[in-house]
Amino acid sequence: MAARNTARKRAFQILFEGDQRGADVLTVLADWVRHSRSDTRQPPVSEYTMELVEGYAGRAERIDELIAQYSVDWTLDRMPVVDRNILRLGAYELLWVDATPDAVVLDEMVQLAKEFSTDESPAFINGLLGRLKELKPSLRRE
């Protein structure tokens, strides 16, 4: 499943870039797709990356509400940008992508935190996404 792992990493990078630039993630996604088509050195943006980014974008407000509600002692603005965007991606895939097992989502997001964030972040990511997983049936409302 290396392709899915890469797709998640690229989706995270797109969400991160959008957050850093204050740009809409769909605009950033379109930029990535356009760039990958015009520069043969860039790998194409996979369908799954597009699905993740577009899915998050369609539920961004609800996802941010959930993260804010269940992150103890952290507001979205105070969270490290990396953690905030790993949580956004993880919350979307956990709650709305039924084809991916919950344990896989948690593991993949923890791995992203290990690669891109602080030493404390993997436990924070795992704890918050684990809580969302427990409450999943009641959280899927639109």
From Swiss-Prot:
GO biological process: DNA-templated transcription termination; transcription antitermination
GO molecular function, one term: RNA binding
GO cellular component terms, semicolon-separated: cytosol
Tree of life domain: Bacteria
Xref: InterPro entries: NusB-like_sf, NusB_fam, NusB_RsmB_TIM44
Pfam families reported for this sequence: NusB (PF01029)
Keywords from the named record: RNA-binding, Transcription, Transcription antitermination, Transcription regulation
Function: Involved in transcription antitermination. Required for transcription of ribosomal RNA (rRNA) genes. Binds specifically to the boxA antiterminator sequence of the ribosomal RNA (rrn) operons.
Entries under PANTHER family matching the protein: ANTITERMINATION NUSB DOMAIN-CONTAINING PROTEIN, N UTILIZATION SUBSTANCE PROTEIN B-RELATED
Similarity comment: Belongs to the NusB family.
Name this polypeptide is given: Transcription antitermination protein NusB
Organism taxonomic ancestry: Bacteria, Bacillati, Actinomycetota, Actinomycetes, Kitasatosporales
